[in-house]
Amino acid sequence: MATTSLDLAKVRNIGIMAHIDAGKTTTTERILFYTGVSYKIGEVHDGAATMDWMEQEQERGITITSAATTCHWPLEDNDYTINIIDTPGHVDFTVEVERSLRVLDGAVTVFDGVAGVEPQSETVWRQADRYGVPRICFVNKLDRTGAEFHRCVDMISDRLGAQPLVMQLPIGAEADFQGVVDLVRMKALVWSADAAKGEMYDVVDIPATHTEAAEEWRGKLVEAVAENDEEVMELFLEGQEPTEEQLYAAIRRVTIASGKSSDTTVTPVFCGTAFKNKGVQPLLDAVVRYLPTPLDVEAIEGHDVKDPEVVVKRKPSEDEPLAALAFKIMSDPHLGKLTFVRVYSGRLVSGTAVLNSVKGRKERIGKIYRMHANKREEIESVGAGDIVAVMGLKQTTTGETLSDDKSPVILESMDFPAPVIQVAIEPKSKGDQEKLGVAIQRLAEEDPSFQVHTNEETGQTIIGGMGELHLEVLVDRMRREFKVEANVGKPQVAYRETIRKTVERVDYTHKKQTGGTGQFAKVQIAIEPIEGGDASYEFVNKVTGGRIPKEYIPSVDAGAQEAMQFGILAGYEMTGVRVTLIDGGYHEVDSSELAFKIAGSQAFKEAARKASPVLLEPMMAVEVTTPEDYMGDVIGDINSRRGQIQAMEERMGARVVKGLVPLSEMFGYVGDLRSKTSGRASYSMQFDSYAEVPRNVAEEIIAKAKGE
């Protein structure tokens, strides 16, 4: 069993992110093959990819859970440790991407050389911008018909607002793609036809056909680096050419600095074809050369356990007290519950006790594993900057902090979006009912965007998620992993309710005096809509002079929040409401927390009825790519679904239609689109915002909810 204290300068914690079909899993597979971890190249096409270890992922050819894998790469006589978090590219799994980005130091973004920057690429890029993650780009699939490297580079600039640094030029195109020109070394890297798996490539002089373009792009590269780096700027102004080493160092500085600033993201761009085994080794060199080590990342910020206002910083050092973030929970068929942890400071040692500072509970660290996609290596301890899987944590959930109990800290947690779609699930037998309970508990632990509640009136179990595919996968896992046989209802939209009018004053007295201890609570509240922003609820206390004792105020707040769970129009959760407690009264003997909670709840319901309540529905940003011939049909169809067309553009000879469409109108869209366009159009959609439902539609929804 190994105990590892890694040299942090030689560690890279990276994610590989992309749109669903850009070839991300294939790229990761090649990385694992060339770094010696995987002896047979796993192919997504035949369902053998190493990272995609859930059965469904192998069937669907997409990555659902981010598996963490450790591999090693030698560069210039040094051995580097690369921890790779594989992230899904399908929009329904954006939560997985969010939580991966939270614990990474750098990322490789993979683009499809044919399609360029696609909708999910933009989403993932924005997520990475939000977390300040430095990136390098890999333009993949250059062996495919219609692949164009430079168009993809332009799209990175135009669509993502980034400044691409072109590091390589392709040699040959489509089926004749042979290798790349390295613009730093000014050499050509050519993969020989003999090496079937692309292990060997030759470093040769740049072919005469490419020297002019190479000179031109080398000049552009140096100029772009000079704009962002003072050292190279000085050389540039003196008319001196930077050396290879100076250029490597400057590109590294620029890439890492752009992650920390809110200005334009500067990103080195590489190219190749992972499927045909060309261009992956230089990409690994680039991961080591340009992406940050845990030491390059600023000290992580958290807050004091007792006072959230007090900022606590922890440097990436083993000399600091322990601070680690649990970012993913997985059920391993052999080991049970595994918690993936990023250690930011201090040391995590097998068999010792740590504090879950969010819950204030002690946890014992069981075994610690360094994970390959579905194999593992046990280690005794792990230090700052590393990512591992831990056994034995019973109470820790995603986003919680493990710290030293003598100097506890709470690291910033992760925000998970509310579900936009839900289905009712009914177990077929009593035995299935019990299994369903276990399955739901496990899946909810693993996936915070999966939510469950019971419909009070029908007694049905309702599960919610981020899209049809997300729920399909969850139900599928219940069947496979937990052997639950259940009937699944049709997907339902997660509507919300809100108010449009301010109600200045509602008085409510809760009184129950029937001998013995009674109940008494009097409240006066106002409610108003919260304009703009994402706040779903605010509570303001304006009670003065002890009219309601301090200890009862939170009960009024709790009562109002409880009432918001079931709105007054159709029982959907309410959002966007500010409640102000103005005044009230109490009784020395009969008042209690419960009495004030009931009063708060009833006063809220009464006020909400008077505040012009309306129904909200999730609107999806839909992007359809279609041949010109079907453009009219596609637009007509979107309009018929209460959609609003927002933009139309041309992309690679096809037309792209962008619009906002209510989710309720998008069920079954994939089949309709296929039949309208003879299967030649494709679409993607992701949640955009909530919008008010038109009155005639709202009336139908309300009547249905009330069973009329």
UniProtKB/Swiss-Prot annotation:
Keywords: Cytoplasm, Elongation factor, GTP-binding, Nucleotide-binding, Protein biosynthesis. Its main location: cytoplasm. GTP binds at residues 18-25, 86-90, 140-143. The keyword Cytoplasm applies. Gene3D superfamilies: 3.30.230.10, 3.30.70.240, Elongation Factor G (Translational Gtpase), domain 3, P-loop containing nucleotide triphosphate hydrolases, Translation factors. One of its GO terms (molecular function) is translation elongation factor activity. The keyword GTP-binding applies. One of its GO terms (cellular component) is cytoplasm. One of its GO terms (biological process) is ribosome disassembly. Pfam families: EF-G_D2 (PF22042), EFG_C (PF00679), EFG_III (PF14492), EFG_IV (PF03764), GTP_EFTU (PF00009). Residues 9-295 form the tr-type G domain. Catalyzes the GTP-dependent ribosomal translocation step during translation elongation. During this step, the ribosome changes from the pre-translocational (PRE) to the post-translocational (POST) state as the newly formed A-site-bound peptidyl-tRNA and P-site-bound deacylated tRNA move to the P and E sites, respectively. Catalyzes the coordinated movement of the two tRNA molecules, the mRNA and conformational changes in the ribosome. NCBIfam families: EF-G, PRK12740.1-3, PRK12740.1-5, small_GTP. PANTHER family: RIBOSOME-RELEASING FACTOR 2, MITOCHONDRIAL, TRANSLATION ELONGATION FACTOR G-RELATED. Belongs to the TRAFAC class translation factor GTPase superfamily. Classic translation factor GTPase family. EF-G/EF-2 subfamily. This is Elongation factor G 1. It comes from Streptomyces coelicolor (strain ATCC BAA-471 / A3(2) / M145). The lineage of its organism: Bacteria, Bacillati, Actinomycetota, Actinomycetes, Kitasatosporales.
